[in-house]
Amino acid sequence: MNQMVDMGHAVPAARGLREARAFAPASVANVAVGFDLLGYPLDGVGDTVTVRRIDAPVVRIAAIRGTTVALPLEAERNTAGAALMSLRAALALPFGFELEIDKGIALSSGMGGSAASCVAALVAANALLDTPVSTGQLYQHALDGEAVASGSRHGDNLGPLFLGGLVLCTLERLVPIAVPEAWHSLVVHPEAVLETRRAREALAGDYRLSEFVAQSTNLALVLAGCHASDADLVRAGLRDVLVEPRRAPLIAGFAQAKQAALAHAALGASISGAGPSVFAWFETRAAAAAAAPAVQAAFAGVGLDSQAWVTPINSPAARLLA
């Protein structure tokens, strides 16, 4: 049975630490049917953040390295910095934090790069507190940080990084969704940039009630299918009739990539987060791996190189490294 996570449980910390380092993975948000609600992490790609406790009562970013360096060094304009500013303000901390961010996730890729930096920073900073705070409190500060990147508080990229696996994320709580261990995800990132704000602008305008009914039906089918380990239910529901039609025209090669995944027995395929990355679900790792070349070939057909990852849907959460 799916249960709501205990949002009051604090993450243990070693007292007296002055520096900590944490890793947070990339993630797939929306998952076709749960816009701003559903997400899951990816194994093997993510961001690492080193946080130092400093005497000055400020948050400052000392360095940003890796795949993406064109990010704000001003703490209030950076998701990781803003999250720690929120944490400091809430706890009235007399000390501050200095961050170094090592990016492993491409900018505006639809793979939750801003969320990964944000959560990694919070996990590391929490280890430096004399009394660590709960997962629920960290989540609220992460929502404040993520709002810097997207303009609104939404947790679909954040919740999975705190819990691991598929998570339903409201603004108040995180609910883990059981998924069969054998099910895997293929994520393909074409070497193109689609800014989150532009992707959200594409969603402006009116929607028909029938579209909401269809999307609600699909969400229910996917959740029921996951709960029952019923691939046929998931296959019937893993379709986005609300958001994908408005964003797909912004992604060159998307239609071909989606069709390639479905032709290789995907349970469903859609846009990862705001795009341009594409995700697909499969019943086995072998099936996901077999589909990867065809999906990448679809992007190559429109002149785009790409990277592909095959990971369990039940991939692990962010973790403290040192």
From Swiss-Prot:
Annotated compartments: Cytoplasm
This enzyme's EC code(s): 2.7.1.39
Catalysis: reaction(s): L-homoserine + ATP = O-phospho-L-homoserine + ADP + H(+)
Pathway involvement of the protein, from the record: Amino-acid biosynthesis; L-threonine biosynthesis; L-threonine from L-aspartate: step 4/5
GO MF annotations in UniProt: ATP binding; homoserine kinase activity
Any GO BP: threonine biosynthetic process
Keyword terms: Amino-acid biosynthesis, ATP-binding, Cytoplasm, Kinase, Nucleotide-binding, Threonine biosynthesis, Transferase
Amino acids binding ATP: A106, L107, S108, S109, G110, M111, G112, G113, S114, A115, A116
GO cellular component: cytoplasm
UniProt main location, coarse: cytoplasm
InterPro entries: GHMP_kinase_C_dom, GHMP_kinase_C_sf, GHMP_kinase_N_dom, Homoserine_kinase, Ribosomal_Su5_D2-typ_SF, Ribsml_uS5_D2-typ_fold_subgr
Function recorded in the entry: Catalyzes the ATP-dependent phosphorylation of L-homoserine to L-homoserine phosphate.
Similarity section: Belongs to the GHMP kinase family. Homoserine kinase subfamily.
Name of the protein in its database record: Homoserine kinase
Species of origin: Xanthomonas campestris pv. campestris (strain 8004)
Gene giving rise to this polypeptide: thrB
